[in-house]
């Protein structure tokens, strides 16, 4: 009958065109679980005659500023392209990984300074005759546990510090 497609259908159509009838990971904000993702699943499974639309769903919490959700309507959004003019993408990525994806992340200057300092420390250690080492399964373990990036970063801190200390213990002066 008369009408227009809803936004759920737009996403199903884009997913099918770009990723196929079934794909591995579908993501979005926690605010999209219902009704958007539920409708996407229902119509995609029916249209494609499949049991599965996406194998894994990742619903992230919000990035906030001063504990307020970023939103265009509130005028408090930050654009990555603007940040890239001020700092490296590595700092931005480390900042985004500093909180579990299902936990809110408050975006602020302290967070960015801490991430910049962490990266500087890692780079200094690498430049200080640091030899690459294989990342152990123990260090990676948090990643396999619901993409626990803060746990992985903590393990990486410990590993980098320990490896750096060991390198200095065996060095001749």
Region annotations inferred by a language model:
Residues 105-107, 111-161:
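Helix-loop elements that line ligand-binding/catalytic pockets
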